[in-house]
Amino acid sequence: SILACLPLFPSFGCTVTLWYPVIYGVNMVTFPTPLETRKLAELVEKYSVTVMISTPTFLRGYLRGVHREQLGSLRLVVTGAEKLPKTVSEAFEERFGKRVLEGYGLTETSPVSNVNLPDPEPLGEDGDGHVWLPSYRPGSVGQLMPGLAVRITDPETGGPRVIHQSRRSWLKGAD
């Protein structure tokens, strides 16, 4: 089940906490505001919520007055809408034992273009398999979503740019 408390007027909240659960038949635990984190933590615990999609600003609220066991059922915590500060990510993981996965997007990508993913289970009968691509890297917004292409350019010249420098990203979808 998913905790559905993000405002619905931005595409992020509308798409990931309303339309995704409705289309895919995922149970939703709804609450009208993401600001009342103590009440939300009670709901997570009461209904054994497994997915929480939030923003870094709202995650900060859980760090004040929410107990570790209240978020024990969560298997996936994803943030978007703003940069995830390392301090918030580390504090949340330390306090609740849950890795926070950061994503990136904009309204035009409805609303996700990149997202970090939980680490996959190792392949192979003995558990000694390998993974082709890392699914999570701290400080990044994760892998590009399937169906998108990206061109990375220098923001000043428009020329090609390598990925670990200041840059402009151009996204293109199928249409």
Task: Give the ranges of each region predicted by the language model.
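Conserved beta-loop-beta connector loops within the AMP-binding
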Residues: L144-K172
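Beta->alpha turn/N-cap motifs
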Residues: T55-P56, D175
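Short, well-ordered beta-strand segments
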Residues: S1-A4, S169-W170
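Gly/Ser/Thr-rich phosphate-binding loop
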Residues: V26, V49-S54, L63-Y136, A149, ...
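AMP-binding (ANL) adenylation modules
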Residues: L6-P10, E156, A174-D175
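Conserved AMP-binding/adenylation subdomain of ANL enzymes
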Residues: S1, F9-T50, G65
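Membrane-embedded alpha-helices of multi-pass transport/permease systems
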Residues: T15, P56-L59
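Short acidic loop-to-helix transition motifs that present clustered carboxylates
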Residues: L35-R38, R60, L84-P85
